Amino acid sequence: ILRQTLRQLRNPAHPLRMAIDRDFSHRVEILDKEDGLVGRGLNASSVEGQLTLFVLSYDSFKNKDGRRAYAENSSLVALTNYQKAQGEAVEVAGADDTALITALAGMHPIVVVDESHHAKSSLSLEMLRNLNPRFVLELTATPSVKSNIISRVSAQELKAEEMVKLPVIVYRRDG
């Protein structure tokens, strides 16, 4: 789902991307974890006044690359210095001033979280808070009872879009 979400959001011909581009005057940047770690698309001139969508899974920040998100990042020095000068910098506990998590927090990104049902740990929730998002869209096959569900997609629709890796067997229980 993560790869397909990225592919669709990055495709200028996809209806969702077309709507986002229309609503934000084509000033939209779609980023994933790897883009952020190398600073791709993250500089003062490109982020000024644009909508930034950062697509990740909670697992993105739990491995070695996750720790790198809190470390000094020379690729982001210009952006974080710009954020400080503009009064947009956000301090993130345990993170370097030039870290990816700090740069993203200062941008107040819209965050699309794949497999959000894994976000039960305090560490996962802290990571999400550290991103300082303006909006979070959670994607999950198993929403909690308290979830604010805005859309449902059937298993057949997911299979038709090749978003399910395993065969899906759906049946109705009578009685």
Would you name each region that the model predicts?
Residues 1-113, 117-128, 150:
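SF2 helicase/translocase NTPase motor core
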Residues 10, 126-134, 154-160:
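Short, surface-exposed basic-aromatic patches at helix termini and helix-loop junctions that form
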Residues 34-36, 142, 174:
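Short, solvent-exposed coil/turn elements at secondary-structure transition points
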Residues 50-51, 107-108, 132-135, 161-167:
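Short glycine-/polar-rich loops that comprise or flank the Walker A/P-loop
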Residues 59, 140, 172:
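Residues at the C-termini of beta-strands that transition into short coil/loop
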Residues 115-119, 130-147, 162:
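Conserved helicase ATPase motor motifs in RecA-like P-loop NTPase domains
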Residues 149-175:
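Conserved interdomain linker/interface between the two RecA-like ATPase lobes of SF2 helicase motors
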